[in-house]
């Protein structure tokens, strides 16, 4: 069967294709390969390219028609690089320094059960802020997620940063278990859509877990170009929906 080149299915990574920061399963890889014989497929993750590669595999840029890291600020088509955006050019070094200094002071004064390291991760198109620190263990990551749900550590921090830096033109997006992303307004996951021409792609599907307001899948899930979005809770949920929607006879 020939591939329908006018239809594409876009996938988030954590809690959609994989468990958070875990490797993709063979079952998921096989189903995606089967789906790719029907339509084009793409991945759009908030993480940087190397982190997505750790989860989806060394050869992942050849397993998808499109790969969008950092919301599409790093974009690949058919295994070839299309674009790399740069937050340094947008904000300038002085503003970046002011922002990071404020974040580090805030985290230093934050009273949470544990802290580890890498509270600010500088990426090409965004800053990733983690109150607990990105190099916490998987168990600590899961414990922080529960703590954050109750105590609203991330959402409170986002509110304070929005007020403090309202002139910077920044957008904030809570994703994953332990962090949130900061990037120029419009550089959310909808950014990737500019690489999918409207005259070429007529039907677009999106699968993601953080589709709620403030989540890093919200903007793309609700974008007018998305034909249908699917809110999922786990890779198992994604598998079930894919089988039911695309393969059920």
UniProtKB/Swiss-Prot annotation:
It is an enzyme of class 5 (isomerase). It catalyses: alpha-D-mannose 1-phosphate = D-mannose 6-phosphate. It is found in: Cytoplasm. InterPro entries: HAD-like_sf (IPR036412), HAD-SF_hydro_IIB (IPR006379), HAD_sf (IPR023214), PMM (IPR005002), PMM_cap (IPR043169). The keyword Metal-binding applies. GO terms for cellular component: cytosol. Its EC number is 5.4.2.8. Keywords: Cytoplasm, Isomerase, Magnesium, Metal-binding. One of its GO terms (molecular function) is phosphomannomutase activity. Pfam families: PMM. Belongs to the eukaryotic PMM family. Homodimer. Involved in the synthesis of the GDP-mannose and dolichol-phosphate-mannose required for a number of critical mannosyl transfer reactions. This is Phosphomannomutase 2. It comes from Dictyostelium discoideum (Social amoeba). The gene is pmmB.
């Amino acid at each position: 069967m020939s591939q329908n080149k006018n239809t594409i299915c876009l996938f988030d990574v954590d809690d959609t294709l994989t468990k958070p920061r875990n490797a993709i399963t063979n079952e998921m890889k096989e189903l995606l390969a089967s789906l790719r014989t029907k339509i084009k497929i793409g991945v759009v993750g908030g993480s940087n390219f190397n982190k997505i590669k750790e989860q989806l595999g060394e050869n992942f840029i050849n397993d998808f028609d499109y790969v969008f890291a950092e919301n599409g600020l790093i974009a690949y088509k058919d295994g070839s690089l299309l674009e790399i955006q740069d937050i340094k050019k947008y904000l300038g070094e002085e503003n970046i320094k002011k922002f990071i200094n404020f974040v580090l002071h805030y985290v230093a004064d934050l009273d949470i059960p544990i802290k580890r390291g890498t509270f600010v991760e500088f990426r090409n198109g965004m800053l990733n802020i983690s109150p607990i620190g990105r190099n916490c263990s998987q168990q600590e990551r899961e414990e922080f997620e529960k703590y954050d749900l109750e105590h609203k550590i991330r959402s409170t921090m986002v509110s304070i940063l929005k007020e403090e830096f309202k002139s910077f033109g920044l957008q904030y997006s809570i994703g994953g278990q332990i962090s949130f992303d900061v990037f120029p307004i419009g550089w959310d996951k909808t950014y990737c859509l500019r690489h999918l021409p409207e005259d070429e792609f007529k039907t677009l599907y999106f699968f993601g877990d953080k589709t709620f307001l403030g989540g890093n899948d919200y903007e793309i899930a609700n974008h007018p170009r998305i034909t249908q979005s699917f809110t999922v809770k786990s890779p198992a949920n994604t598998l079930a929906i894919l089988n039911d929607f695309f393969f059920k006879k």
